[in-house]
């Protein structure tokens, strides 16, 4: 069936999908057509937000239907994802497990635990204080190291 997805900024695209297609799959198609990252998309049908795990047929979306696309600001997405990560026990992530093993080699169990907890708090605090400018600078350094190196050499002379 043919669907039209219209962003609030005025861009729109037509997509060919199956009636029982997952909303998450539709978001990937929209991402390809409109160049909007999936995690920044919120699709609406008749004013109702569509859940990723549901199918288009669950919302009675038929041929020639029109869906609205709301693009969430990246800052909001990052904040939401940060909150979700805090709900998960951060000590379960592989990097924290690895750090825990290293600390255990050099400290008693109690001291290693306290150092790990403080390190996690400091890490979370540092991440929460990053601005978009900070993130842009970091990304530029990773993506264009030759420019950063040239700038540093220029400033050192």
From Swiss-Prot:
Q: Where in the cell is it found?
A: Cytoplasm, Cytosol; Nucleus
Could you tell me which residues belong to the region Required and sufficient for interaction with BAG6? 96-138
Q: Which UniProt keywords apply?
A: Cytoplasm, Isopeptide bond, Nucleus, Phosphoprotein, Transport, Ubl conjugation
Instruction: Name the GO terms of the biological process aspect.
Output: post-translational protein targeting to endoplasmic reticulum membrane; regulation of protein stability; tail-anchored membrane protein insertion into ER membrane; ubiquitin-dependent protein catabolic process
InterPro entries the record matches: Ubiquitin-like_dom (IPR000626), Ubiquitin-like_domsf (IPR029071), Ubiquitin_CS (IPR019954), Ubiquitin_dom (IPR019956), Ubl4_C_TUGS (IPR041421), UBL4A-like (IPR047154), Ubl_UBL4A-like (IPR044724)
> Which residues are recorded as modified (Phosphoserine)?
90
Q: Which PROSITE patterns match?
A: UBIQUITIN_1, UBIQUITIN_2
Name all Ubiquitin-like domain ranges: 1-76
Q: Where is this cross-link: Glycyl lysine isopeptide (Lys-Gly) (interchain with G-Cter in ubiquitin)?
A: 48
Transmembrane stretches in the record are none
Q: Describe the subunit structure.
A: Component of the BAG6/BAT3 complex, at least composed of BAG6, UBL4A and GET4/TRC35. Interacts with BAG6; the interaction is direct and required for UBL4A protein stability. Interacts with USP13; may be indirect via BAG6.
Protein name per UniProt? Ubiquitin-like protein 4A
Give the encoding gene's name.
Ubl4a
């Amino acid at each position: 069936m043919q669907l039209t997805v219209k962003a609030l900024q005025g861009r729109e695209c037509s997509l060919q999908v199956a009636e029982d297609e997952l909303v998450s799959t539709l978001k990937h198609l929209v991402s390809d057509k409109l160049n909007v990252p999936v995690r920044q998309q919120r699709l609406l049908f008749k004013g109702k937000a569509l859940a990723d795990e549901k199918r288009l047929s669950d919302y009675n979306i038929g041929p020639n239907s029109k869906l609205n696309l709301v693009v969430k600001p990246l800052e909001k997405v990052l904040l939401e994802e940060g909150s979700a990560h805090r709900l998960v026990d951060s000590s379960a992530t592989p990097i924290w497990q690895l750090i825990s093993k290293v600390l255990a080699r050099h400290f008693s169990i109690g001291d290693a635990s306290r150092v790990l907890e403080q390190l996690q708090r400091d890490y979370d605090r540092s991440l929460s204080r990053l601005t978009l400018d900070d993130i842009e600078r970091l990304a530029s350094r990773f993506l264009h190291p030759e420019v950063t190196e040239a700038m540093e050499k220029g400033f050192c002379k």
